[in-house]
From Swiss-Prot:
PROSITE patterns given in the database record: EXPANSIN_CBD (PS50843), EXPANSIN_EG45 (PS50842)
Glycosylation sites: 118
Every Expansin-like EG45 domain range: 56-161
Main location: secreted
SUPFAM superfamilies: Barwin-like endoglucanases, PHL pollen allergen
Name by which UniProt lists this protein: Expansin-like A1
Family: Belongs to the expansin family. Expansin-like A subfamily.
GO cellular component: extracellular region
Keyword Glycoprotein tagged: yes
Location of the Expansin-like CBD domain: 175-258
Pfam families: DPBB_1 (PF03330), Expansin_C (PF01357)
Amino acid sequence: MAVSVRCCFGSSSLSHHARLLLVIVALLAPRLASGCDRCVRRSRAAYYTSSLTLTAGSCGYGTAAATFNGGGFLAAAGPALYRGGVGCGACYQVRCKDKKLCSNAGARVVVTDRARTNRTGLVLSSPAFAAMARPGMAASLTELAAVDVEYKRVPCEYRHRSLSVRVDERSRGPNELTISFLYQGGQTDIVAVDVAQVGSSSWKFMTREHGPSWSMANAPPGPLQMRLVVTGGYDGKWVWADREVLPRRWRAGEVYDTGVQITDIAQEGCFPCDTHEWK
């Protein structure tokens, strides 16, 4: 396994000018305010009675969502968190504000769907909603249709998994390639993806289709290596998977291990900043 992380802003970092502009715009906003990696925000949260709704969510994770975050603590996010699909896979700590019913720690959830309501900012799976309760109060909490909550983005942790790539069923090899990223750690967004044949320095960029899905119509022949630009701190960083990620004859529907994991934390702009762990 070979992993290297480098600052992305150099003369040869991004060959495509439009992508470079996109990265700069995405990374410039946090510089305009005090940096914080634990911005606490307020909203309301409801819950789905069936978690199947979230595993079949608009992020497109399918059955893989059942393996995220312990397999059940999932959420659908409103527009501010969903961000047109860019927010797919992000992790949040959510707690309700009724201290009689709810614990201080709350529940940690991962976004797998878009909330189809404007009444709440989050719709949790029923296990996640119940997990916000104090001991013995879960039944009372779930009797409520929705509750006031506060939440903050937190790093996703997949201790026993690397960042993985699933080749979408729509891919038509060897040139038409669509992939989705699974088990993305850290507290970042992937803002650019390049692929190249292993051993080659001729990188080609992929285009974001939606959320964790990226595609290209002119994929180089395999085996393929990858490099990503992720937000981290106030900057962007290259994450290199300079090994065989996709084999020469990759197959649609298969999941491949990149051999790397993301641990960076991107800064947000907010005040005050919550630096305390919710316990």
